Swiss-Prot record:
Name of the protein in question: Matrix protein 2
GO cellular component term of the entry, any: host cell plasma membrane
Function: Forms a proton-selective ion channel that is necessary for the efficient release of the viral genome during virus entry. After attaching to the cell surface, the virion enters the cell by endocytosis. Acidification of the endosome triggers M2 ion channel activity.
Miscellaneous comment in the UniProt entry for this protein: When the channel is activated, one or more imidazole moieties of His-37 probably become bi-protonated.
Species whose genome carries this gene: Influenza A virus (strain A/Duck/Hong Kong/2986.1/2000 H5N1 genotype C)
Positions marked as site (Essential for channel activity, possibly by being protonated during channel activation, and by forming the channel gate and the selective filter): 37
Signal peptide: none
Virion surface side of membrane: 1-22
Residues linked to a lipid group, S-palmitoyl cysteine type: 50
Region (Disordered): 60-83
Transmembrane feature ranges: 23-43
Record's subcellular location: Virion membrane; Host apical cell membrane
Keyword annotations: Disulfide bond, Host cell membrane, Host membrane, Host-virus interaction, Hydrogen ion transport, Inhibition of host autophagy by virus, Ion channel, Ion transport, Lipoprotein, Membrane, Palmitate, Phosphoprotein, Signal-anchor, Transmembrane, Transmembrane helix, Transport, Viral ion channel, Virion
Length: 97
């Protein structure tokens, strides 16, 4: 016999599964894993933009400053800010008539 004929057998009313009332630990574990997988898949599809954006940009916060003295942290912040600051003297203003 095939697995299909052993698990699902036609009855007088309709198709039924013999293992639906089973208390076999393997069946219970498979059911729990299946339900958890379905819930996680639904959550992933609902919130995938938020989740992957957080993973993509949330992890790029710069180097850790744990264990670094406050004076060095401030110096680092100033260096980063000075690298970002733009010198207005390098731009040419063009006035259209």
């Amino acid at each position: 016999m095939s697995l299909l004929t052993e698990v699902e057998t036609p009855t007088r009313n309709e198709w039924e599964c013999r293992c639906s009332g089973s208390s076999d630990p393997l069946v219970v574990a498979a059911s729990i894993i299946g339900i958890l997988h379905l819930i996680l898949w639904i959550l992933d599809r609902l919130f995938f933009k938020c989740i992957y954006r957080r993973l993509k940009y949330g992890l790029k916060r710069g180097p850790s400053t744990e264990g670094v003295p406050e004076s060095m942290r401030e110096e680092y912040r100033q260096e980063q800010q000075s690298a970002v600051d733009v010198d207005d003297g390098h731009f040419v203003n063009i006035e259209l008539e």
